[in-house]
Amino acid sequence: MKPKRLRLALAAAATAGLFLAPAAGGGSAEFDPLLDGAPLCAAPAGGPPALLRHLVLAAAETAPFQPAPPRPALGEAPVLYANLGTLSFKAGTRNARAQAWFDQGIRLAFAFNHAEAQRAFREAQKEDPRCALCFWGEALVLGPNINVPMLPEASGPALAALAKAVELEASAPARDRFLIEALAKRYSADPKAERAALDAAYADAMAAVAQRYPGDDTILTLYAEAMMDTQPWDYWEAGGAKPKGRGAAIVATLEQVLERNPRHPGAIHLYIHAVEASTQPGKALPYANRLPALMPGAGHLVHMPAHIYYRVGMYRESLAINKRAMAADEAYFRTSPSDPLYKAAYYPHNIHFLMVSAQMGGDGTAAIAAAAKLDAAMPAEVVAQFAIMQPVKAAPYTTHAQFAAPDAILALPAPPANLALVAALHRYARAVAFAQKKDVAAARAEIEAIARIGRDADWKPFAEWGVPAKEIVETARVVATGRLADATGDLDGAAKAYEDAIFIEDSLPYTEPPYWYYPVRQSLGAVRLRQGRLDEAEQAFRESLARVRNNGWALAGLAATYKRKGDAPAARATQRAYAAAWFGDAKGPALDRL
């Protein structure tokens, strides 16, 4: 056995040990933990994924929010919204308007609309120029967060706002003074100061504030966020079972808040991020369900349950919530000039999530419509400047490969050649289309074009952003090879290609949505089923479901496998799970499209 195939076999065997193996003699119980809501048996590869984080950073660098110029640069006068919930944090002011603007700033800060939050804090300062915490709030939102490191142009305004807060703190309540003093640890006038050390110092200072005020839910939430900013998107060791760094303290702090206040929107938002890459993302589900109603005007918070819905296999709910998030953002854009960063990154993220949720549930119509909207939201000239944007720009081609007719795929316009990853996925879609048409020569030409891109493109810009672009391209090449072999009846060749693709897919780091659009194990299972190798088909489908819950494509294949095996109880249980998960074409997926 070749080393790569051996490693794949060992990985499969290790995974198989984590869930129920087929019963001896082919029997199977009605209850199956893969079909009935058990924790995930396998988490994605560890490490910081940061797809949204880097997408946001790229948008920030493309059109950064400029806080330093005079107030008109912030746009029209902000609106005091009535649809951002009721979270309140006393700001040491007797001015009701100042408190209202301050509360809006805090709400928007927890919703990651930091530029709009700054506008609110500035309005609070206008209403009460002696409100120390109103200046603290502005300094807070100009700092780093889990999606964006602190931008150089924000340093001056942050220090200025902090200095004003310090100037006013003598007359502020004690709690406010402690918060201001803690935030002072986060910033330095020295441009050479190490950001990681400043972030750690701030987190440590917030730990002391949290110890002084253990009953203050917002302070504990701010403390948790300070810890998260020291290791953004990297809270779990590989496998997702063991917390990493401050990960255990982050989770414990947020759970302490949510146990007594399960409606704190900031704590829910951060808790979703804290556990989504773990083996138990479902722990956040009850809170995620509440979040959209708590701040219905904050599109990003309306979207956030999708991070859990997708991980636990609730694709129908993920699709629906992202529609609501898009509507909330579009309403917000009509009333505010908006930060270009928010509009160019967070809003397309909602569209992307909607698209992949529709893909997983089999809703080709919704997926293709979202693909068009996503493509339009990401201009090629902007994407060309930032490699991190290319996986998202390329994603619509995978939607067409999955659902569109071959001729429709072949009619798609080619992307600019300088978008290497996008071009490779365009070639992938074309290879799939030609394979379906059984045009072997044309499919091989497209596969060779993918290989050529993999060999010749400059992948360094992608590596700098942490994007495994070369691995994505190689996955595309190998899957396309499998599709062609499958279409021409070479099932052994197809199985080998899919096994090779699985090996690469398993190495891709965690991000939501995933870097590769579907679990390739379902394709391997479909081939083994058509070969009559039923135990291997069952294993492939079950391994797929252990990684990607409630995947209707894999459930359809597994149900067909049990039917072929004569295992009626297992077939019934799987068919029920499939019926609940699938919301696409009533005929269901064809085996050769898995």
PLM regions and their residue ranges:
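Gram-negative bacterial Sec-dependent N-terminal signal peptides
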Residues: K4-P22
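Extended HEAT/HEAT-like alpha-solenoid repeat tracts in very large eukaryotic scaffold/adaptor proteins
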Residues: A344-H349, P468-A476
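C-terminal non-catalytic interaction modules
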Residues: Q539-L594
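Generic long, charged, amphipathic alpha-helical segments
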Residues: A476, A495-L545
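N-terminal alpha-helical interaction modules that lie
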Residues: G26-Y271, E276-A284, N289-M295, V312-L319, ...
